């Protein structure tokens, strides 16, 4: 029993202790719970207070909305006109209609002018008062509106000039057409159809004249330039030899060609030139008939082989006082006595020297038959480039 009592006591004590402990623990528990509950309540109260504050902040933010924007006004000093009821252009650039066209306005303390091309205020040196636009914008505007000048090359090379005005850093490229130009049909029909194989016929007759002689340098002495006075002019009454059968060959033209381009036609042609009409009116003067009668008679025509030119005599007494085309002195030689003109051999026409018989005849008849200049002229009768005179005894 004691044990039990003791055990009971012990148990009671233990129970008291337990109760006391339980009480203490409970107390402790309740204290911890109270502290936890107090902390939880504090946290809850803080959360609720924060939540309430957030709701209140949203309301404050909603209540404190920004005021409506101010109406646009003109930025020119001293104006400040409300632009709410005007066009959007003036509202966007903040300038009234009146100051947009004023020549001088004050903006930000500077005298400026509104440019209606770029919609900005520019200072007066940058502005063109006549065009009412800034110079930079105006230059670009004119380049864009300028049209190329009309012409045959405007369609092909219209963009060539514009490419040189671009910025230096940009690459430039253009296309040039090197194709053969097309000849209009009107011009093409007006040109004569000339073939390379065409040649000038030998029957072409050149009408003689002072200005339109075909071969001035080749047939010197045959047309207007047949005789020269001591002053360089043509002799008015110098006797001349002329016959319609005379023909100037291409070889004769070659001997006297200097720079005359018309002689080139005779070089291309295989037929001889016919210069029967190349003498002027003064070649048919009365001294011609007298000279023709002296050489071959008035009725007998003089053959082409008899016509001579530029004979250089051995003695200085045979030279006249004036020079011809090629620098040699031209003389008028009457035929020596006993010379028959009709018996000249045809093969001796193109030789530049006399036969032995002719030289003897000329030396024998030279002192008595010296020619005298007619009509007071110092010129000879005729001049030719072959330098040949053929007479036979």
From Swiss-Prot:
Residues 273-293, 380-393 have a biased composition (Polar residues). It is found in: Nucleus. Its main location: nucleus. Zn(2+) 2 binds at residues 115, 118, 122, 134. Residues 40-67, 137-158, 273-301, 317-393 are annotated as: Disordered. Expressed in young panicles. A zinc finger (SBP-type) spans 71-148. A motif (Bipartite nuclear localization signal) lies at residues 131-147. The SBP-type zinc finger is required for the binding to DNA. PANTHER family: SQUAMOSA PROMOTER-BINDING-LIKE PROTEIN 4, SQUAMOSA PROMOTER-BINDING-LIKE PROTEIN 6. Trans-acting factor that binds specifically to the consensus nucleotide sequence 5'-TNCGTACAA-3'. May be involved in panicle development. This is Squamosa promoter-binding-like protein 17. It comes from Oryza sativa subsp. japonica. The gene is SPL17.
């Amino acid at each position: 029993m004691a044990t039990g009592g003791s055990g009971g006591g012990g148990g009671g004590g233990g129970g008291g202790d337990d109760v006391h402990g339980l009480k203490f623990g409970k107390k402790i528990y309740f204290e911890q719970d109270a502290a936890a509950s107090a902390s939880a309540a504090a946290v809850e109260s803080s959360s609720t207070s924060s939540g309430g504050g957030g709701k209140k902040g949203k309301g404050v933010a909603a209540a404190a909305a920004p005021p409506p924007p101010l109406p646009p006004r003109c930025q020119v000093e001293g104006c400040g006109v409300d632009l709410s009821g005007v066009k959007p252009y003036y509202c966007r650039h903040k300038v009234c209609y009146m100051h947009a066209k004023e020549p001088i306005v004050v903006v930000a303390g500077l005298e400026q002018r509104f440019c209606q091309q770029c919609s900005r205020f520019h200072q007066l040196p940058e502005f063109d008062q006549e065009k009412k636009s800034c110079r930079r914008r105006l230059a670009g505007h004119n380049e864009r509106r300028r049209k190329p000048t009309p012409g045959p090359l405007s369609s092909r090379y219209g963009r060539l000039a514009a490419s040189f005005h671009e910025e230096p850093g940009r690459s430039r490229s253009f296309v040039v057409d090197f194709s053969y130009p097309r000849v209009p049909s009107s011009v093409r029909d007006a040109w004569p159809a000339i073939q390379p194989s065409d040649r000038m016929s030998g029957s072409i007759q050149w009408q003689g004249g002072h200005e339109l002689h075909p071969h001035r340098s080749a047939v010197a002495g045959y047309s207007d330039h047949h005789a020269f006075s001591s002053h360089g002019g043509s002799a008015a009454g110098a006797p001349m030899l002329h016959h319609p059968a005379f023909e100037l060959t291409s070889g004769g033209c070659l001997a006297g060609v200097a720079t005359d381009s018309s002689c080139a036609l005779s070089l291309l042609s295989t037929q001889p030139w016919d210069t029967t009409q190349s003498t002027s009116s003064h070649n048919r003067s009365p001294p011609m008939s007298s000279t023709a009668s002296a050489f071959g008679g008035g009725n007998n025509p003089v053959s082409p082989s008899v016509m001579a030119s530029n004979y250089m005599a051995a003695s200085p007494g045979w030279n006249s006082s004036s020079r011809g085309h090629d620098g040699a002195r031209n003389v008028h030689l009457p035929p020596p006595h006993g010379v028959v003109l009709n018996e000249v051999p045809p093969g001796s026409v193109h030789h530049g020297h006399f036969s032995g018989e002719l030289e003897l005849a000329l030396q024998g008849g030279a002192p008595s038959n010296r020619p005298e200049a007619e009509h007071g002229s110092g010129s000879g009768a005729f001049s030719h480039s072959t330098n040949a005179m053929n007479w036979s005894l």
